[in-house]
Regions:
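Bacterial N-terminal signal peptides that target proteins for export
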Residues: 1-10
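Selective detector of the "anchor" transmembrane alpha-helix that sits immediately C-terminal
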Residues: 418-442
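Cytoplasmic C-terminal tails of single-pass
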Residues: 443-452
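N-terminal cationic leader/targeting segments used for protein routing and processing
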Residues: 4, 406-407, 450
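Flexible loop/hinge segments at secondary-structure junctions
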Residues: 25-402, 406-412, 419, 429-430
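Bacterial N-terminal signal peptides
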Residues: 9-20
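Short, Lys/Arg-rich N-terminal segment immediately upstream of the first membrane anchor
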Residues: 1-2, 413, 451
Length: 452
């Protein structure tokens, strides 16, 4: 009987102890609803559809905070970040050592994971028919393969009737993180590319025509028959452009970019990632191993100064920025899959949250702790949800929706739920203590009886 009580007691205690600490995570205080704030930002076009959707959804919750994000490319975003003309930047490429020296104490906050597609316009060919290896892709962009029916392409696609047409190569004309990701992949799979062209946000292209932003390259491909180029997955869906299956790093499979294959490429990356305030240069999930890993996958980042006095003299802007980015990398992740981005894992969210807690304004923490404790719901699984192949165009104007009494009631109910949960936990602990006291008392009585 005593052993059984001890076992039950131990079980109850372990149940309480195993409640994850992340279940009740701290959060920064909400923006002051009585103060209007505009946050200016710029950078990568790669995550622009997602950032633009965040702008709208965050604006519904906090209509007094407006995000003005300019999709000018990672290169332009980094330049503006270094010159301190924007509040934060977005980039698909981590800062190089020289850029980190020019912008010291910059935090890298992962915001999403995406894939760069090899998109093409082949009249008469349906989506997903074309298969390409990294070496063939490199030779196309080197200008060595100039026809779609070149034996190097035809041998990878037996049974597919490829046209005897000149290939029109489309690439970025601006400094771009998408370019950095793409050419980093080419440098890994082609020694000739690595030696002749190399890696960067902007390179000397051996062949092709340029387009500004992912939007521009997508437009070139869509309007130019027999063209091929590289664009982020969301833009391929958005513009209904077919894209190729690319040979994986192991050489065992041709993999289409998808939620599952991009997630597979990022699987296992979290434990190896640095902290937000550390260098991210060289961090990559490009050409990650795995039978179903899409080889041209990447994190995309928000760049934020630890000292916000570098970019603003307004305390409300500083406080609102911290809250908004915290929302983007936690609650905002639920919007990622609808635009074909992979949400960041809870462990990666924590890197960003820990980084935000380092942010200072006027010598004090810009992270002001909220009075309530929020539940952080994990948002990524090993098999992400497959969504319909349609993506809304980026929003032109913010949709401002005033907070309703229902929203206020929801917040009060969440707070009440938290207190009820805490009360239940305290009651459980009290019950355990009573059981322990009973056991001790029974043991003492038994001991006294034996002595008598």
């Amino acid at each position: 009987m005593t052993k059984r009580i001890v076992a039950i007691t131990t079980s109850l205690l372990m149940t309480i102890l195993l409640i994850p600490a992340s279940a009740f995570a701290s959060s920064p205080v909400e923006p002051d609803p009585g103060v209007d704030v505009q946050i200016d930002a710029a950078g990568a076009s790669f995550p622009f559809p997602l950032i633009d959707l965040w702008r709208v959804e965050y604006g519904k919750l906090y209509p007094n905070v407006q995000l003005n994000y300019q999709s000018i490319g990672s290169g332009g975003g980094v330049k503006n970040h270094i010159s301190e003309t924007i509040v934060f930047a977005a980039s698909d490429a981590p800062l190089k050592p020289t850029e980190s020296e020019a912008a010291p104490n910059t935090l890298h906050i992962p915001e999403a994971i995406g894939g760069v597609t090899i998109a093409y316009n082949l009249p008469g060919m349906s989506e997903s028919e074309l298969k390409l290896t990294g070496e063939v892709i490199a030779d196309i962009f080197l200008g060595k393969i100039t026809k779609f029916n070149d034996p190097a392409i035809q041998n990878l696609n037996p049974g597919v009737s490829l046209p005897d047409e000149d290939i029109v190569v489309a690439h970025r004309s601006d400094g771009a993180g998408t370019t950095f990701v793409f050419v980093s992949y080419l440098a890994q799979v082609s020694q000739e590319w690595d030696e002749k062209v190399g890696v960067g946000k902007s390179v000397e292209w051996p062949a092709g025509i340029g387009g500004k932003g992912n939007e521009g390259v997508a437009n070139v491909i869509k309007t130019t028959p027999y063209s091929i180029g590289y664009i982020e997955l969301a833009y391929a869906f958005q513009n209904d452009i077919p894209y190729a299956a690319v040979e994986n790093a192991d050489g065992t499979n041709f993999v289409l970019p998808s939620m599952q294959s991009i997630a597979a490429a990022s699987a296992g990356a979290a434990p190896t990632l640095p902290q937000a305030h550390e260098s991210w240069y060289g961090i990559s999930i490009i050409n990650a191993p795995g039978d179903n890993s899409y080889p041209i996958s990447t994190f995309t980042y928000l760049l934020v100064y630890e000292n916000l006095n570098n970019v603003t003299n307004d305390p409300d802007t500083a406080q609102s920025l911290v809250h908004m980015i915290h929302w983007m990398i936690t609650d905002g992740q639920k919007f990622s899959e609808s635009l074909h981005y992979v949400p960041i894992a809870p462990e990666v969210q924590k890197i960003g949250i820990d980084g935000l807690k380092r942010v200072q304004f006027n010598g004090e923490s810009a992270w002001v702790e909220s009075d309530t404790t929020s539940y952080v719901q994990p948002v990524i699984t090993e098999q992400p949800t497959v969504v319909e192949e349609s993506v809304p165009q980026p929003y032109e104007q913010p949709i401002v929706v005033q907070q309703t009494n229902n929203q206020s009631l929801s917040s009060e109910m969440e707070l009440l739920s938290f207190y009820i949960t805490a009360l239940i936990a305290l009651i459980a602990i009290a019950v355990i203590l009573v059981i322990i006291l009973i056991i001790v008392n029974m043991s003492l009585v038994a001991s006294i009886k034996k002595k008598i």
